[in-house]
Amino acid sequence: MDPEAFSASLFKWDPRGAMPPPTRLLEAAVAPPPPPPVLPPPQPLSAAYSIRTRELGGLEELFQAYGIRYYTAAKIAELGFTVNTLLDMKDEELDDMMNSLSQIFRWELLVGERYGIKAAIRAERRRLEEEELRRRSHLLSDGGTNALDALSQEGLSEEPVQQQEREAVGSGGGGTTWEVVAAVGGGRMKQRRRKKVVSTGRERRGRASAEEDEETEEGQEDEWNINDAGGGISERQREHPFIVTEPGEVARGKKNGLDYLFHLYEQCRDFLIQVQNIAKERGEKCPTKVTNQVFRYAKKAGASYINKPKMRHYVHCYALHCLDEEASNALRRAFKERGENVGAWRQACYKPLVAIAARQGWDIDTIFNAHPRLAIWYVPTRLRQLCHSERSNAAAAASSSVSGGVGDHLPHF
């Protein structure tokens, strides 16, 4: 064996294990660090919001302003509930949903969250109803205006009214996630606070006479005529004064005739039927008479010329028109010939109604309830008082005549 070959193979260096020279070590120490890996561009906030919106099904916009935590809304969406599902649920079903949420996820709902969920659903229902009413009134405005003008002969005037803007409802108790949603989502679901309208200086005075009560209620007409559908400049329909007209006569100029007045009562009946249908669909209590709910519905539908003070002011005139149309027409002709104003005609409508009540046992409530068009209206307090007074006078006259007749037949001592 060659010793040189053996020594060469024994002392052969492995290049993989060889250390670099000192100069190389110094270069490695001062070499710049490698560039960081290129990260994907951050996801835009709007895209994240859209993904979050799809995940929650719109619940974040529904609940954000009512103090519901984001985790609560996420768990409700995880259970499969959407905005449309919650809007169609009753209060009992909402309670069951919240109890299931607490039991399944071991998530204790705050007291404010339980009330906030129901409040948010009620507010969304009202918003959808107002949008539907505005849509219907816009569709019916072309066809309904012509018929209304034919009856009223320019009976309505439109006056711009400056209104204050509504305050937006502040966000509450949701954490940073809600803040991100609010910063991006904006105001599709802005909740508006209703401001109470301050009455214009007409004080209420408690008096026994129902006539004075009706006059006091007339001061609220401006409040009910104010349009609540948003801020800025809106249009308010102001009623022209009534004048006495004969049957079939159209009022001239900026006046309204009595046929138009009676037509308003027929419109109230139609609005009552619509309110009843809506209440039946929701499983709520149906009104059987024209109440404040009907007047609010009429105002939202665009019929702001229908208001409680005016309709109550002339309801006994409409009752005479329904119970005895011939007598009502004769009274209208007589007052038109004499040139009397509508106030005198209104006062004169009481006497025929009292005579009708006298022929039917003085029970004016039964008379109203028995008539299909009058059953939906409350009997005016003034009319009931007049019937009671006339009944007492008739009873006193009858008793005095009986006592006088008996005294004439008594023997004289």
Curated annotation (Swiss-Prot):
Expressed in floral meristems and in indeterminate vegetative meristems. It comes from Nicotiana tabacum. The record marks 285, 292, 296, 343 as: Interaction with DNA. Keywords: Activator, Developmental protein, DNA-binding, Nucleus, Transcription, Transcription regulation. Pfam families: C_LFY_FLO (PF17538), SAM_LFY (PF01698). PANTHER family: PROTEIN LEAFY. Residues 154-177, 191-239 are annotated as: Disordered. One of its GO terms (biological process) is regulation of DNA-templated transcription. This is Floricaula/leafy homolog 1. One of its GO terms (cellular component) is nucleus. Residues 238-242, 307-314, 378-381 bind DNA. Its main location: nucleus. Residues 201-210 have a biased composition (Basic and acidic residues). One of its GO terms (molecular function) is DNA binding. InterPro entries: FLO/LFY_C (IPR035209), FLO_LFY (IPR002910), Floricaula/leafy_C_sf (IPR038276), LFY_SAM (IPR035079). It is found in: Nucleus. Residues 211-225 have a biased composition (Acidic residues). Probable transcription factor that act to specify determinacy in the progenitor cells for both flowers and leaves.
